[in-house]
Amino acid sequence: MAVIKMKPTSPGMRGMVKISRDHLHKGEPYAPLLEPQFQHSGRNNNGHITVRHKGGGHKHHYRVVDFKRNKDAIPAKVERIEYDPNRTAHIALICYADGERAYIIAPRGLEVGATILSGSEAPIRVGNTLPIRNIPVGSTIHCIEMQIGKGAQIARSAGTSATLLAREGTYAQVRMRSGEVRKIHIECRATIGEVANEEHSLRRLGKAGVKRWMGIRPTVRGVVMNPVDHPHGGGEGKTGEGRHPVDPWGNLTKGYRTRNNKRTQVMIVSRRKK
């Protein structure tokens, strides 16, 4: 995979850095695994904005990705690696020996034509999915379940992974990229390797219009609003917040921790690094 630095032929192209997709499939996606994706632009059923800064963007279909990988002991062949507009990671189209096809998150190093396997008997090889109890300590893993059979929820973005640190009884300790160490049941599944497209972090959009293509609208600072619109608003001339930073509804922000989930607090061995 290569990084493409665009020539400064216009202000928008100056500084733009793209990620090469020459190795990806250039045709249409696999139609039976597509679903329509409707745009709500951050509005609820009353038309009121419930999520700001959303709207517009390019239309695209949703690719149904298999996060459970529960088709055990049936080998699958990688047919192609594809671009997915819904996520930063690339996806791989696999074909099982019985003819069924599925999309999975493409791990780094997975090649077209490779054979992958799921289940407790699968070998320790990139792309194979196993219960954590069967994965050697120290392995690099991704697409990790948090609840047995629910499907992968952790380490699904481009270039991400986690490390299996230890196993104690029915739980294993897994260190995330953030530095957080979390306990996960050993019957939960994980996939060997790290997610592909690790150069995604080097991408530079170059211009505001690219954000609009992604369906992201501008974020206006509170200090330039009127007092009726934001607690930071108002004042004669250029002024600061005049208080601790808050959101439009007066809740503390910028470093204020809002996590309040006592039910899963016991699963966190050490908090993430700032």
UniProtKB/Swiss-Prot annotation:
Cellular-component GO terms for this entry: large ribosomal subunit
Keyword terms of this UniProt record: Ribonucleoprotein, Ribosomal protein, RNA-binding, rRNA-binding
Keyword Acetylation recorded: no
Pfam name, any one: Ribosomal_L2
Biased composition regions of type Basic and acidic residues, renumbered to the chain: 229-246
Any one of the GO BP annotations: cytoplasmic translation
Classification via InterPro entries: NA-bd_OB-fold, Rib_uL2_dom2, Ribosomal_uL2, Ribosomal_uL2_bac/org-type, Ribosomal_uL2_C, Ribosomal_uL2_CS, Ribosomal_uL2_dom3, Ribosomal_uL2_RNA-bd_dom
SMART domains for this protein: Ribosomal_L2 (SM01383), Ribosomal_L2_C (SM01382)
Cell division among keywords: no
Region described as Disordered: spans on this chain: 224-256
Family per record: Belongs to the universal ribosomal protein uL2 family.
Subunit structure: Part of the 50S ribosomal subunit. Forms a bridge to the 30S subunit in the 70S ribosome.
Protein name as catalogued: Large ribosomal subunit protein uL2
Provenance organism: Polaromonas naphthalenivorans (strain CJ2)
